[in-house]
Amino acid sequence: MEKWWLNSMLRNRELAYKCGLSKSTDRFGPIENTSVSEDPPILTDMDKNIHSWNDIENCSYNNVDYLVGVENIRNFLSNKSFLVRDSKRNSYSIYFAIENQILEIDNDHLFLSELESFFSRYTNSIYLNNSSKGDGDHYMYDTESSWNNNINSFIENYIRSQICIDNYILGDGDKYNDSYFYSYICSTIRKKSSERERTSIITSTNNLNDSDFTKIEGSNDLDETQKYKHLWIECENCYGLNYKKILKSKMNICEHCGYHLKMSSSDRIELSIDPGTWNPMDEDMISVDPIEFHSEEEPYKDRIDSYQKTTGLTEAVQTGTGHLNGIPVAIGIMDFEFMGGSMGSVVGEKITRLVEYATNQLLPLIVVCASGGARMQEGSLSLMQMAKISSALYDYQLNKKLFYVSILTSPTTGGVTASFGMLGDIIIAEPNAYIAFAGKRVIEQTLNKAVPEGSQAAEYLFHKGLFDSIVPRNPLKGILSELFQLHAFFPLIQNEKESRS
């Protein structure tokens, strides 16, 4: 994976390199080495240092490798988080989206003061040098306006002057025509998934000799990773870092390798159900420790309370009704974050009631499975939920001839796999989902035999005929809608929607 460093954006004298993207989209443009003086001309002679579109391909570069592949330019421009160093070498996190005009900075008043001071000087200089260009110049801003109102404009214009980008890459040629995007990107930190190594490359701008880039390896990168750990989610497959605030919009799919990360039940409801149509069922049903399970570490009730506070859920499943592309459905979604999605008496009862409600209302049924199996703290009461749910599904499927779709996510194991997880009329699995009855560790310890790698992955099991299809999250809602319509479940017309509401 690659993590970008925007190094010392606040130091005027370090504005030494210009990065250009040529009009040809198959290569990253050259980097020009400009001179740097004690009084940097970038603030007073900006126009002299900016090349026109016709001059882009004439730039030359020395001792500088490509900074980023062309295929990553779109992502770089739209949404990126930068680790920014100020003049005192302190690091801060900045999330910046030009197109959406979003700017988020670590809340540190000293850093913000320095940033404000720099951009105030920068904007004043640009305003004075371009005051004769007319009202249409995009460098002209009211320098007396408040910091809060103009910070996005300051940074956007600062970034516009160093990288020349083809208009179509931005998707808005009119807005960004004849403008330049500044980038003072010092380097990338490349992380190898196998070795878990991190290397940072930082531009050396104080001394412009033959070695324009200094490579630094060590524990500093690990410290930075820990410092900003709350901003990122690490992919369990490639170990790439995904920014938390945009991961949800990507359906919790790793932007580096496409791996499907775990997803909360609430996010799945938002993904599958039409907005404003979700009606939860049995939200107040909670476990009361039916067998008074004894634990030397933490009492069962206390553990339940802890997970309720952490997840905001009452149990490991959410059940209810809603519309999927206008089609009324009954849906149950298990949440692995709540005690590993384990199936206790409450989980079994909620799913059974959901099946019975769908039977009475003649609704199609969806159950999204994500579970480690039966909950050991409830003993045989948790095991009997397998038979109870299966019995309700028998009436739903065979007697009422209704349609049940089972969706297996990672992980789906134990009693859930052995019961309702495998009883769907259509069984769908997510890519790379871990699906098994007994886990790999349990099998190896019990049978003293090694479990072949990948033998419990969705792709291998699909080829063995264990389920019907592997469907990524992106097209899942549309595919479910088509399946329901093939089985004579159609979207409600407006009058029916109003009468049901």
UniProtKB/Swiss-Prot annotation:
Protein name: Acetyl-coenzyme A carboxylase carboxyl transferase subunit beta, chloroplastic
Cofactors named for this entry: Zn(2+)
Keyword Plastid: yes
Domain of life: Eukaryota
InterPro entries for the chain: AcCoA_carboxyl_beta (IPR034733), Acetyl_CoA_COase_Trfase_b_su (IPR000438), ClpP/crotonase-like_dom_sf (IPR029045), COA_CT_N (IPR011762)
Family: Belongs to the AccD/PCCB family.
HAMAP family to which the protein is assigned, alphabetical: AcetylCoA_CT_beta (MF_01395)
Keywords: ATP-binding, Chloroplast, Fatty acid biosynthesis, Fatty acid metabolism, Lipid biosynthesis, Lipid metabolism, Metal-binding, Nucleotide-binding, Plastid, Transferase, Zinc, Zinc-finger
Pathway(s) annotated for this protein in UniProt: Lipid metabolism; malonyl-CoA biosynthesis; malonyl-CoA from acetyl-CoA: step 1/1
Lipid metabolism in keyword set: yes
GO molecular function per UniProt: acetyl-CoA carboxylase activity; ATP binding; carboxyl- or carbamoyltransferase activity; zinc ion binding
Ranges annotated as C4-type zinc finger: 235-257
Record text on subunit structure and interactions: Acetyl-CoA carboxylase is a heterohexamer composed of biotin carboxyl carrier protein, biotin carboxylase and 2 subunits each of ACCase subunit alpha and ACCase plastid-coded subunit beta (accD).
Cofactor info, note text: Binds 1 zinc ion per subunit.
Domain CoA carboxyltransferase N-terminal: 231-501
Organism of derivation: Lotus japonicus
Binding site for Zn(2+): C235, C238, C254, C257
Alphabetical list of NCBIfam families matching this protein: accD (TIGR00515)
GO CC entries: acetyl-CoA carboxylase complex; chloroplast stroma
Job description of the protein: Component of the acetyl coenzyme A carboxylase (ACC) complex. Biotin carboxylase (BC) catalyzes the carboxylation of biotin on its carrier protein (BCCP) and then the CO(2) group is transferred by the transcarboxylase to acetyl-CoA to form malonyl-CoA.
Entry EC no(s): 2.1.3.15
Known catalytic reactions: N(6)-carboxybiotinyl-L-lysyl-[protein] + acetyl-CoA = N(6)-biotinyl-L-lysyl-[protein] + malonyl-CoA
